[in-house]
Amino acid sequence: MYKQQYFISGKVQGVGFRFFTEQIANNMKLKGFVKNLNDGRVEIVAFFNTNEQMKKFEKLLKNGNKYSNIENIEKKTLDENYPFQFNNFKIYY
């Protein structure tokens, strides 16, 4: 399993980007979450079954939705012992 954390910057808050991300993740049967950060970025934690699944998700993120403008995606691989387990993918408020 691949566990990744993303920090997305650009025009990503107030434009439906979290909902867009949740839709993609749920369509791909991913687990994790998406949430807005106080500094204007969006944080995503996602668990993938395959590298191909991860690459597809990242490609869709880079394109964003029609209202967003993605300037940068910072990616971090999470430790195998990442403490949270998820049953689905959801938006944290």
UniProtKB/Swiss-Prot annotation:
Q: Which InterPro entries match?
A: Acylphosphatase, Acylphosphatase-like_dom, Acylphosphatase-like_dom_sf, Acylphosphatase_CS
Molecular functions per Gene Ontology: acylphosphatase activity
Tell me the leader sequence span. none
Provide the Acylphosphatase-like domain boundaries: 3-93
Active-site residues from the entry: R18, N36
Keyword check for Hydrolase: yes
Enzyme Commission identifier(s): 3.6.1.7
The protein's annotated catalytic reaction(s) are: an acyl phosphate + H2O = a carboxylate + phosphate + H(+)
**One matching Pfam family:** Acylphosphatase
Keyword annotations? Hydrolase, Plasmid
Q: Which Gene3D superfamilies match?
A: 3.30.70.100
**Member of which family?**
Belongs to the acylphosphatase family.
* Protein name, per record: Acylphosphatase
Organism of provenance = Borrelia garinii subsp. bavariensis (strain ATCC BAA-2496 / DSM 23469 / PBi)
